[in-house]
Amino acid sequence: MFGMLSLPTYEAKAVKTRTSLPAQSSNPSTSSCIAYDVITKSITVSCTNPTRLTDVNNALHNSDILAKQSPDGIWFLRANLVISKGAVFHIDSTDTKWLKISSEQAASSSSSSINAASVIPYHIDVHGSLGIHSVKITSWNPTTNNYAITNGSREAVPAGTKGATFNGYIIHLGAPRPFIKVEHDATGTTNITNSEVAYLGYESGSTSNVGSGGLNYYGGNNSIISGNSIHDLYFGFYSSGVSDMVIQYNTVYNNANYGLDPHTGTHDMVIRYNVVHDNGAQGIICSLNCYNILIENNRLYHNEKAGIMFSRNMFNSVARNNIIYNEVDGIIISQSNNNKIYNNTISNPQYGINLIYSSSGNTIYSNIIKNSSKYGIYISQVAQGGNNNNTFYNNQLINSPSNIGSGLHSKPSSDFKNNLSPTNILR
C-alpha cells in the first residue's frame, strides 16, 4: 500500500488518496439559473446546487437544443454546455445513460479563452464543478446517425522544417468533433468515474489552449479520473498547469495521438493502474516543465511510439512498477533531469530505456529489459549537450543483441562510462 512506503519528498507529494462524492439529488428549482443564448448556441448553468440534464430539459423545454431520446436516459445535445464559476453540474446515472453531443458546429465559442469569432463544434466548457459518473459520453453525427469521425494528425519533425509550427509539428487539420474542456478558472473539480468517454476531439491546428484534443484540463485541481474507458479521442487526456490529480484504473486505447499527456507545468499527479494501448503516439508522455509526477503499476503495449516518455524538463518524477511490452521504446528520457526509473519490466522493444537530448541526474535501477531488438539501454549525446551524471545499477538486460555489448550502448563511449554502474546483470 502507498501509505506504507518511505518516499523522498517529491514521491510522497505525488501519492494522493481521494474518494469520489456520491451523486446528489436533482435541484428542485433551476429555472432562474439555466439560460440559453441563441447567438452562441450555449446553455449556461449557474446553479450552485447540483444540477442535471433533467433540470436543463425542464427549464428549456426545447428538444432542438436538448432531447431525451429514451426513457432510460439517452440524451442528444445540440448546444454548448457551459458550467459557470461556482456552479455544480452532474452527468450521472440518476437520469443519464448516454449523452450524445452533436458534431454540428456552433456559431461561435462561449468561452473567453477562445476567439469568439471561431466556429467550433459543440462542447462542454467547465468553469465550475462537473461530476461524470457511470455514463457514456460521445460525439454524434446526426447525418450519418453514428459517432463523428475525424482524420487530422500532427507529425513531429526537425526544427526548421518547411511548413512546421514553431514547436516542430506538421499539422493536418481534422473534421471538428465535440470536446470537454476544464478551464483555467474552474472553481471546483471535474471528476470522471466508471464511465465511457469516446469519439471526441480533433486536430484544430492549435498549439495552445483551444482544448480540442478531446478531454482537456487547464484547471480543476484535485480532480479524479478513475475506472473509465477512454478511447477514440484525439488525445486521450491532456492537461496544462493542473495539480493534485489522480488518473487510475482506466483503459485508454485507440486514441489518435497520445494516450495520457500531462503537459506544461502539470505537477503532483498520480498515474497508476491504467491499461494504455494502441494509441497513435506515446502511451504516457509528460512534457514541458512537469514535476512530481508518479507513474506506477500501469500496463502499456502496442502504442505507436514509446510506452512512457519524460520530455522537455520533466523533473523530480518517478516511473516504477510498470509493465511495458511491444513498443518502439519502452521508456524515453529526453531533456529531463533528476528522475527515478525503477522496477519496470520492459519486453520486446526496439530500445528498452533510451536517454536522449541532455538528460542528467537520473537514476535508473532494478529494471528488467528483455528481448530488445536494438538496444537494452541506449544513451546518446547530441549537439545540445551530453547526458551526464546519470546512475544505472542492478538492471537486468536479457537477450539483447550480443554485438552491442549485451544490450548496453552509449554514444560516445566516454559519456557512457560516467553513467553506467558495473552492477547491471547481463544475460
Predicted regions and their residues:
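Beta-strand/loop edge motif enriched in small/polar residues
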Residues: 15-296, 301-325, 329, 335, ...
